[in-house]
Amino acid sequence: MNNSVITVIGKDRVGIVYDVSKILAENQINILNISQQLMDDFFTMIILVDTSKCSKSRQEVLDLFAEESKKLALDIRMQNEEIFQAMHRI
């Protein structure tokens, strides 16, 4: 895997950054850059990560985020950095 962009959206509460960064650390996914913002009661976060040391396949990581999204009541998505940039280019 190359660098990836993770987006997190959900209702604001204590511990969101911890919950997401814990998942990343447990899977040897390194945070390269992180940005977060509150919009009213909604929390948004974009994280650029290095997945080169992660032993799981891309699909396994996507499945993990899908599972954790349900548990944490968050929308957590991961995209390849190049695809993310192409989709958000003006």
UniProtKB/Swiss-Prot annotation:
Protein family: Belongs to the UPF0237 family.
GO biological process terms on file: DNA-templated transcription
Start and end residues of each ACT domain: 5-83
Protein name: UPF0237 protein NMB1653
One GO location term (cellular component): cytosol
Segments forming a coiled coil: none
InterPro entries xref list: ACT-like_dom_sf, ACT_dom, UPF0237/GcvR_regulator, UPF0237_ACT
Organism (species): Neisseria meningitidis serogroup B (strain ATCC BAA-335 / MC58)
Cleaved signal peptide residues: none
